[in-house]
Swiss-Prot record:
It comes from Lactococcus lactis subsp. lactis (strain IL1403). Disulfide bonds: none annotated. Keywords: Cytoplasm, DNA damage, DNA repair, Hydrolase. One of its GO terms (cellular component) is cytoplasm. The active site is at residue 62. It is found in: Cytoplasm. Its EC number is 3.2.2.27. This is Uracil-DNA glycosylase. Its main location: cytoplasm. Excises uracil residues from the DNA which can arise as a result of misincorporation of dUMP residues by DNA polymerase or due to deamination of cytosine. SMART domains: UDG, UreE_C. Belongs to the uracil-DNA glycosylase (UDG) superfamily. UNG family. GO terms for biological process: base-excision repair, AP site formation via deaminated base removal.
């Protein structure tokens, strides 16, 4: 993990033995088999989006388990893959178009660089084994990231899609931050509350009202 302004708050909050256990878990799992994202991208979300620049937090579950797809950013998918994109990112693009934003590619790096923390609750996944690392090591870390963002004074938007992410609402101070909850953008649930929820325009309205610059979701 590269040193960022997330580093010290995390070390202050987590148990003293957490990071040695985390390093042991990473070393062991990456030696035993194919695990995604690449090891140097595990913490890419907090490396690309410092706490001081974080305006929006989108919570995902875990990385894509297919080779070459996971980038260390929730929902983001390499632009080099033009076909067979995950249905969730396709539905996110549909909602963007409905809200007047045009984003043709599925790489969300530019969002992260604007202050959108794309945080998976579980940061690694074995090949073709979705959610297999849930409950292993990551949740104490990612829950604390959410709490640190919530405790920060600058108003933020927390976007929680689906039952898994919505459970994180209890970690957030809703009196100063905007919490946007909706169905997950997967095909199973997108038509039951994700489409038409307008998370991107609502986010920008809140940011502008709180004196911050909006996100260019088209990037």
């Amino acid at each position: 993990m590269k040193k960022t302004d997330w580093s010290q708050p995390l070390r202050n909050r987590l148990a003293e033995d957490y990071f040695p256990k985390m390093i042991e878990f990473i070393n062991q799992t990456y030696q035993e088999g194919k695990v995604y994202p690449p090891e140097n991208q595990i913490f890419r979300a907090i490396e690309l989006t410092p706490l001081a620049q974080t305006k929006v937090i989108i919570v995902g579950q875990d990385p894509y388990p297919q080779p070459g797809k996971a980038q260390g950013l929730a929902f983001s998918y390499p632009a080099t893959f033009k076909v067979n994109r995950p249905d969730s990112i396709v539905n996110i693009q549909k909602e963007l178009r409905e809200e007047g934003f045009s984003k043709d590619d599925s790489d969300l790096t530019a969002w992260a660089e604007q202050g959108v923390l794309l945080l998976n609750a579980v940061l690694t996944v074995p090949e073709f084994a979705s959610n297999a690392h849930a409950g292993k090591i990551w949740e104490p870390l990612t829950d604390e990231i959410i709490k640190i963002a919530s405790d920060d004074e600058r108003p933020k938007v927390f976007i929680l899609w689906g039952g898994f992410a919505r459970k994180k609402a209890k970690l957030i101070d809703g009196s100063k931050h905007l919490i946007l909850e909706a169905a997950h953008p997967s095909p199973l649930s997108a038509s039951r509350g994700f489409f038409g929820s307008h998370p991107f325009s609502k986010t920008n309205e809140f940011l502008v009202e709180s004196g911050q610059s909006p996100i260019d979701w088209s990037k």
